[in-house]
């Protein structure tokens, strides 16, 4: 009987060790995928210091001296907290939800493409003032900075492939 118990104990110990390692790995990767709200971000496109404070609910408060820097920080913060939502809304405006979620979104995609929301939005840019375009560019620069940070901090995985 002890010949049977010893292999069972070894198997149980190996199973426990493997399970523990998997849990540690998943925890590590999950924690590393969350944004670090306490780090300093440096970018040459920011003209003056910008401070982003988060309250106990992680709601950001941006303090800066220029509108461009504020919009840069806003883009960065949005990409930190809402990147998935931003990508999903972009896919929605392009009428490409069925590429992600399957055939049940084909009718929705057809309607969106018929309304041509994406191209109409792109065409509306020519009616914006130079000041507004500069602010939107600052916002986009903030998003792109966050995407670059994700890529560089990807633990060798690179940027996440969302679709």
Regions found by a protein language model. Name each.
Residues 4-42:
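N-terminal type II signal-anchor transmembrane helix
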């Amino acid at each position: 009987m002890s010949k049977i118990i010893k292999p069972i104990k070894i198997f149980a110990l190996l199973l426990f060790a493997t399970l523990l390692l998997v849990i540690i790995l998943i925890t590590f990767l999950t924690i590393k995928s969350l944004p670090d709200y306490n780090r300093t971000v440096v970018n040459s496109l920011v003209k003056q210091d910008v401070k982003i404070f988060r309250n106990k609910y992680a709601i950001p408060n941006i303090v800066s001296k220029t509108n461009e820097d504020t919009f840069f920080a806003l883009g960065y913060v949005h990409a930190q907290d809402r990147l998935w939502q931003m990508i999903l809304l972009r896919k929605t405006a392009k009428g490409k939800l069925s590429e992600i979620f399957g055939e049940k979104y084909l009718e929705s995609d057809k309607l969106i493409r018929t309304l041509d929301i994406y191209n109409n939005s792109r065409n509306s840019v020519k009616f914006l003032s130079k000041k507004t375009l500069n602010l939107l560019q600052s916002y986009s620069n903030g998003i792109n900075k966050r995407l670059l940070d994700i890529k560089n901090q990807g633990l060798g995985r690179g940027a996440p492939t969302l679709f």
